[in-house]
Amino acid sequence: MSLYVKCVKLSNNAIIPNRSMSGSAGYDLYSAYSYTVKPYNRILVRTDICLMIPDKCYGRISPRSGLSLNYNIDIGGGVIDSDYRGEIGIVFINNGCSDFNIKVGDRIAQIIFERVEYPIMEEVKCLEDTERGNSGFGSSGM
């Protein structure tokens, strides 16, 4: 069964998210405006796109690997819930040491649609033990 995501363009600069390759998991998100992002700064990039994500799904905003590798760009965590109807904004982080220019129509991030479960939270006094126990960061090897 196919999933449908309804899209609204808020301006002529908006571009409907799309996959660049048939095997791509993420749908590219595009800037609707031009920006200059100073080194070690973050901005909210507007896409001028609103989405209606199906129930029991959400959209996860993720970085584009080429921007990360080549320009030290990161994207702030973003979860787009199925009941959100506002504009999709991207927290764009320049970790590089020079200005980064974004032009109208530049691909800046991607959205990956994932199914979600809604478990019932149950308070208990203790948890069953496992081999790992409460060993945290790095405990399973580097």
Curated annotation (Swiss-Prot):
It catalyses: dUTP + H2O = dUMP + diphosphate + H(+). Keywords: Hydrolase, Magnesium, Metal-binding, Nucleotide metabolism. Its EC number is 3.6.1.23. One of its GO terms (molecular function) is magnesium ion binding. Its cofactor is Mg(2+). It is an enzyme of class 3 (hydrolase). One of its GO terms (biological process) is dUTP catabolic process. The keyword Iron-sulfur does not apply. It comes from the Viruses. Pfam families: dUTPase. Coiled coil: none annotated. Belongs to the dUTPase family. NCBIfam families: dut (TIGR00576), PRK00601.1 (NF001862). This enzyme is involved in nucleotide metabolism: it produces dUMP, the immediate precursor of thymidine nucleotides and it decreases the intracellular concentration of dUTP so that uracil cannot be incorporated into DNA. PANTHER family: DEOXYURIDINE 5'-TRIPHOSPHATE NUCLEOTIDOHYDROLASE (PTHR11241:SF0). This is Deoxyuridine 5'-triphosphate nucleotidohydrolase. It comes from Swinepox virus (strain Kasza).
